[in-house]
Every structure is written in structure tokens, then in C-alpha cells.
């Protein structure tokens, strides 16, 4: 995902410095070209050799090191960088950058950078809330730096409060959001549904399906990385939340209907990837239904047709994409649904095909519009999501 991208990590003197070794490793695994610049104080917390081993690049500390790779190293690395993250960022280095003081390799390099720059403060709570530090952070924001707010919790000094550097995964998420994809969806409001619904039978039982939400979550993630303003309406799943998106948790088909209709009011694109129940029990027992001799019949009633409602009153400028999971007659059934529901696109797959369906990390889909039918090869669900977004963006032109 970061192949061909250069990430510069600036590490300052903080006990949290050791965590950046893991971040560097995570970035390398995503095929980024990672360079680390350390302050002299940072070397008291972690050895530069650690970063050199993990990244395969020399860790820079001394501005006047004669064994450099580039002619003017801080300038050439600044030109090479696609993103510069200072983490952990001490109060000292924050103050220097905010006030134009460039007296070491880290500060001189970041001053020469024109790429996106992120600052992740990490320090004692009283230091972080100090008006001088806060003024410096506001000044950096004014100059286009993005400040990653610290977490609150138990700090190395023994205090509890704000000042804790976020996890490596959070820092990685910020980097991915900034440079992983071209921002061709900036300004677009996209709503995607994901996961199953649960239709209550009694206080302990419900009717549901095997949807894990992986496809919908992949769509939300890739749209976010491409700059879209994403609303993810999700049933009960066991997936990590997608960062930087609005998540609306629902349980039943009725919940899903209400959430989608509300979100549709200002959406540009709606992708219905959730597996919504077509039927629900006509009666919900207030008490647990007891086992008795003989069989039991449960009367069912239709739930509201969410995408049908959207299609019947579709306004100009709204792009509607549905999903159709079938076990037989996939193309015929999906084409009927495309027309009947007044959709712009439908994504069909057969749950019986290997690599497709619920719970897998891959999918095999056929993209159907009024004018074309396109079979896509087996891909990861993130790759499928990207391919779908490509086709939606092209169709909207």
C-alpha cells in the first residue's frame, strides 16, 4: 500500500521512543522506504542501530556527519519525503520547530520539507497543558502541520492524564490516510452498510446470518483513504473500527432502514453491502420461549426494503450501488434487482464459489450496470473495494 512512498520519522527524547521501532517495522512491511532522524537525546532511549536494522537505511543524528549518503543530506531527504512524522515529539522540539529554530538534523530537515508534516506530542501532562506548549502547537497548526492529539492514561512519570503517545497502529493510520492513496474522492459523501442484522425472537434468541462485514468495512476503508467523507452503518461484527469514518451501530433491519434513510439525505454515493434480513418474527416474546413437545412454527413478516425505497425516490446526483449474493442464477437475479430497484450498479457474487462469500478475506464478484457486465478475478476484499470505487467514480463522470 505504501510502495514507492518515502516516510521520514523524527524521533525525539522521550520514553515512548522505543515504540517507533515497531512503527518503522510496520511501515517497512507495507513496502515504504523509511528513514529515521533522531535527536541526540533520543539516542539515550533507543539505539540508532535498531532503526538501521529495521529500515535498511542509515539513521541520521549528526548534521555534520561526514559519512552521509547525499550531498546535503537534510535537504535531499526533505525533497525525497512523502510525509514527515515527528513521534514522539518533545516540548523542546515542538518549540524549536514552531519558532523556526533549526539546530540539528531533525529540525533542519523538517524546515526544508514541503510534504505533509505530522506532530505527535508525548510528555508529562503539566508540560502538555502548559500555555507555551499549547501556543506552539497552535502555531504549528497555523503553518499546516497536523497535530495528533495524545492519549490520556498512566504516564512514565507516574502521573495520569493527557500526554501519552498514541499506539503505533494509530500513527500508522494517520500516515496511511495522508499518503496511501490519491485523493480522488475528496468532497464526496459516501454511505456504506456492512454486516448482518439481528431480528429478535425473544430476550435470548434472534434470527441473523453469517455476514462478517469484511466487504463493507473494506469499502469504507478504501473510500476514506481516497479522501471521501464516509459514514459506515454497521451491524454487529467482530472487526476493528475503520479509522477516520463516522460509524453508526445498528442491530435490526428497522435500525438499518432508519439510519440509511437519514444518511441518504446528503449522500453522494450509497453502497449497500450489508446482509439485511428480509423477514423478521411477527411477534417478539417478552419472556424466553420454553421448549415444548412437538414442533413450533414462527410466523415471519417482511422487513422494509431499504434499497428499494432509496431507488424509488432517488434524486439526481445520488449513485446507488447494491450487492446481490446468490446461490443460483446469479446474473439473471442480479439484473432483475438492478432494474427493479432502480440501481446504478449491482455487485453480484455466488456464495458457493471458492474465495467468495461470508467470512473470507477474498471475493469474486461481477459488476453489473445497465450497459455492461464485468467479471473481476479473485482479489482481496480491499482490492475489490478499490476496483468498485474506481468504477463508481468513472460512472459518475
Residue spans for each PLM region:
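A cross-family phosphate/adenosyl-ligand binding-site feature
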Residues: 1-118, 124-213, 217-397
Amino acid at each position: 500500500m505504501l510502495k514507492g512512498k518515502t516516510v521520514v520519522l523524527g524521533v525525539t527524547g522521550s520514553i515512548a521512543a522505543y515504540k517507533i521501532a515497531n512503527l518503522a517495522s510496520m511501515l517497512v512491511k507495507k513496502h515504504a522506504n523509511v528513514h529515521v532522524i533522531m535527536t541526540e537525546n533520543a539516542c539515550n532511549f533507543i539505539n540508532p542501530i535498531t532503526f538501521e536494522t529495521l529500515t535498511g537505511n542509515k539513521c541520521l543524528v549528526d548534521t555534520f556527519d561526514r559519512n552521509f549518503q547525499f550531498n546535503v543530506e537534510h535537504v535531499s531527504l526533505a525533497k525525497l519525503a512523502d510525509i514527515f512524522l515527528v513521534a514522539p515529539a518533545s516540548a523542546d522540539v515542538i518549540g524549536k520547530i514552531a519558532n523556526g529554530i533549526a539546530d540539528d538534523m531533525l529540525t533542519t530537515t523538517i524546515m526544508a520539507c514541503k510534504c505533509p508534516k505530522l506532530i505527535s506530542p508525548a510528555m508529562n501532562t503539566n508540560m502538555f497543558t502548559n500555555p507555551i506548549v499549547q501556543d506552539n502547537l497552535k502555531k504549528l497548526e497555523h503553518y499546516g502541520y497536523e497535530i495528533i492529539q495524545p492519549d490520556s492514561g498512566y504516564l512514565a512519570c507516574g502521573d495520569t492524564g493527557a500526554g501519552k503517545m498514541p499506539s503505533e497502529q494509530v500513527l500508522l493510520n494517520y500516515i496511511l490516510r495522508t499518503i496511501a492513496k490519491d485523493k480522488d474522492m475528496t468532497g464526496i459523501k459516501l454511505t456504506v452498510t456492512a454486516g448482518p442484522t439481528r431480528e429478535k425472537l425473544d430476550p435470548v434468541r434472534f434470527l441473523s446470518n453469517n455476514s462478517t462485514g469484511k466487504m463493507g468495512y473494506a469499502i469504507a476503508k478504501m473510500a476514506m483513504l481516497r479522501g471521501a467523507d464516509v459514514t459506515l452503518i454497521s451491524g454487529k461484527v467482530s472487526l476493528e473500527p475503520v479509522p477516520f469514518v463516522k460509524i453508526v451501530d445498528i442491530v435490526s433491519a428497522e435500525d438499518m432502514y432508519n439510519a440509511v434513510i437519514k444518511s441518504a439525505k446528503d449522500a453522494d454515493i450509497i453502497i449497500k453491502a450489508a446482509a439485511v434480513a428480509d423477514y423478521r418474527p411477527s411477534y417478539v416474546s417478552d419472556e424466553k420461549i420454553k421448549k415444548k413437545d412437538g414442533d413450533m412454527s414462527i410466523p415471519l413478516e417482511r422487513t422494509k426494503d431499504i434499497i428499494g425505497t432509496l431507488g424509488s425516490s432517488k434524486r439526481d446526483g445520488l449513485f446507488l450501488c447494491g450487492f446481490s449474493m446468490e446461490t443460483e442464477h446469479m446474473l439473471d437475479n442480479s439484473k432483475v434487482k438492478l432494474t427493479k430497484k432502480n440501481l446504478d450498479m449491482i455487485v453480484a457474487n455466488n456464495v458457493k464459489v471458492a474465495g467468495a462469500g461470508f467470512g473470507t478475506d477474498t471475493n469474486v464478484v461481477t459488476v453489473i450496470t445497465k450497459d455492461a457486465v464485468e467479471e473481476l478475478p479473485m482479489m482481496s476484499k480491499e482490492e475489490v473495494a478499490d476496483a468498485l470505487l474506481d468504477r463508481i467514480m468513472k460512472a459518475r463522470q
